């Protein structure tokens, strides 16, 4: 499958086809996923994609310009696939197709818009876009099941930690990352992974979003040391590219639905680990 075929299949997809994709991807994830933390091997390059929010045009641009189909590179999506953008249904179909066809190269993280029960978001127009395209409520119900199979975080050992929002402020072991979903809602680890934001403070404060926390540099330093990573890469904010905590944190957004610039990143995992300032210079803005 090449990109042109994928775009055509996505635009012409039917209810039966997307339900089939979901079923096939769930089977893949059942075999692949041992816990909430994906371990990515430090081979080849890794394409990093932030929030998409139904922005099919930006997703296609990234796949084309990163040359995903012409290489053995891996790609990680940091969550928030639907809502806000009118092509949310198509974005889901395309991502499911990528995972089905390239299971070992595609990593899908959970964002706050792929919420567990009790952490619902607003606005949430994904059900509308799915029903409009596929004339069915069943697709949305299956998509919600798919969310529960997504990774909460990913790690390239000794190099990079990936989450959608941020790192839990009271995290005491890597096992709590691995079991974030199982511990929810008794523990707030999953909520914070999906909702937290970095800021230039020392410790942490409750988030003005109403869920999660705002975390400071000391939290970042503690968690990166704990999981044996050097740079945190996350999304969750429509900033294009931003650096926090003296180069320890990189925020990347890959959607234009907010009217802002978008970006993606391609990291050579076989090279020396880069800090967020160095990664920001490598990012492709569009």
PLM feature spans:
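Feature recognizes metal-dependent phosphohydrolase scaffolds
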Residues: 1-286
């Amino acid at each position: 499958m090449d990109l042109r075929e994928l775009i055509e299949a996505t635009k012409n997809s039917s209810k039966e086809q997307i339900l089939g994709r979901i079923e096939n991807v769930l089977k893949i994830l059942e075999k692949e996923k041992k816990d909430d933390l994906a371990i990515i091997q430090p081979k080849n390059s890794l394409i990093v994609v932030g929030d998409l929010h139904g922005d099919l045009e930006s997703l296609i641009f990234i796949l084309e310009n990163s040359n995903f189909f012409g290489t053995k590179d891996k790609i990680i999506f940091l969550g928030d696939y639907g809502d806000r953008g009118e092509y949310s249904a198509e974005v889901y179909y395309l991502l499911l197709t990528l995972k089905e066809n390239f299971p070992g190269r595609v990593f899908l993280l959970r964002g706050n818009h792929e919420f567990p029960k009790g952490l619902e978001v607003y606005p949430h127009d994904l059900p509308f876009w799915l029903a409009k395209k596929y004339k069915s409520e069943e697709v949305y119900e299956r998509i919600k099941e798919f969310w529960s199979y997504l990774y909460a975080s990913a790690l390239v050992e000794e190099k990079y930690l990936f989450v959608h929002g941020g790192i839990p402020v009271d995290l005491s072991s890597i096992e709590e990352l691995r079991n974030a979903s199982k511990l929810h809602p008794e523990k707030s680890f999953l909520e914070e992974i999906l909702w937290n934001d970095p800021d230039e403070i020392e410790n942490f404060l409750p988030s003005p979003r109403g869920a999660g926390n705002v975390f400071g540099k000391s939290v970042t330093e503690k968690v990166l040391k704990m999981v044996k990573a050097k740079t945190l890469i996350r999304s969750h904010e429509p900033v294009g590219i931003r650096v926090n905590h003296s180069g320890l944190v990189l925020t990347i957004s890959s959607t234009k639905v907010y009217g802002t610039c978008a970006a993606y990143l391609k990291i050579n995992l076989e090279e020396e680990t880069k800090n967020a300032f160095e990664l920001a210079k490598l990012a492709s803005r569009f």
